[in-house]
């Protein structure tokens, strides 16, 4: 092997090794760049999937900590619940950033008596990888065969069974009062945009009559 080729070969190996060793920091750096400017202050479009306002929240068909979950009662706060429908905590950078931001502001929701529960289509093993990495204490449940998202009327129908992304929802938030009544929703047509955590809390408090 010629000296130049040896040098190129060694540099390539070192680059690959560095990429492997620092793959998670690199991934997070890329995700940070991708998600810059994703948060907005309000629901600024007319995209409005999901259960009707003033209807009864229909429940879930999901798993949480190895058991079946159909009700959101165990996740609710004294004044209500925000159900966060998210695409994936395994591959969707916007979803990951949103949940990290919600976690950063969880104390504010707790102080307002508003519980949060997140639901994605991910396998629980993939969810826990994210939860453990970022110290997420917000409950995260796993939809079963897209049944929750179908029932809620938020399943993204651009994908078909067998496709990688089949089962993802239109991402958004549903505000439910202590009696199980839907009192507010935040859905944006662009999956790359989300209402920020503080703005979502302000919206939820108003919808629940807490202001």
Label the predicted regions.
Residues 96-148:
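Structural microenvironment flanking redox-active thiols in thiol-disulfide oxidoreductases
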Residues 65-66, 145, 179:
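Residue-level recognition of short loop/turn positions
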Residues 30-73:
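N-terminal "domain-start" segment that seeds a small globular fold
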Residues 135-139, 154-161, 166-174:
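Structural micro-motif
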Residues 164-211:
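Thiol-/selenol-based redox modules, centered on thioredoxin-like
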Residues 6-22:
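Hydrophobic membrane-insertion alpha-helices, especially the h-region
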Residues 71-102:
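Short active-site neighborhood of thiol/selenol oxidoreductases, capturing the structured segment around
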């Amino acid at each position: 092997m010629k000296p130049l080729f040896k040098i190129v070969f060694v540099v390539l190996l070192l680059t690959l090794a560095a990429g492997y060793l620092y793959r998670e920091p690199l991934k997070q750096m890329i995700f940070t760049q991708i998600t810059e400017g994703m948060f907005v202050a309000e629901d600024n479009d007319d995209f409005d999937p999901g259960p009707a306002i003033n209807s009864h929240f229909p429940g879930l068909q999901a798993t949480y900590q190895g058991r079946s979950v159909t009700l959101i009662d165990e996740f609710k706060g004294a004044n209500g619940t925000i159900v966060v429908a998210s695409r994936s905590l395994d591959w969707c950078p916007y979803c990951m950033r949103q949940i990290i931001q919600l976690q950063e502001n969880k104390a504010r929701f707790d102080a307002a008596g508003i519980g949060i529960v997140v639901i994605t289509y991910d396998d629980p093993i993939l969810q826990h990888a994210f939860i453990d990495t970022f110290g997420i204490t917000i409950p995260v449940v796993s939809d079963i065969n897209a049944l929750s998202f179908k029932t809620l009327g938020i399943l993204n129908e651009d994908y078909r069974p067998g496709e990688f992304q089949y089962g993802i929802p239109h991402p958004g938030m549903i505000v439910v009062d202590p009696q199980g009544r839907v009192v507010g929703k935040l859905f944006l047509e662009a999956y790359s945009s989300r209402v920020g955590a503080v703005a979502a809390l302000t919206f939820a408090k108003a919808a629940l009559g807490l202001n």
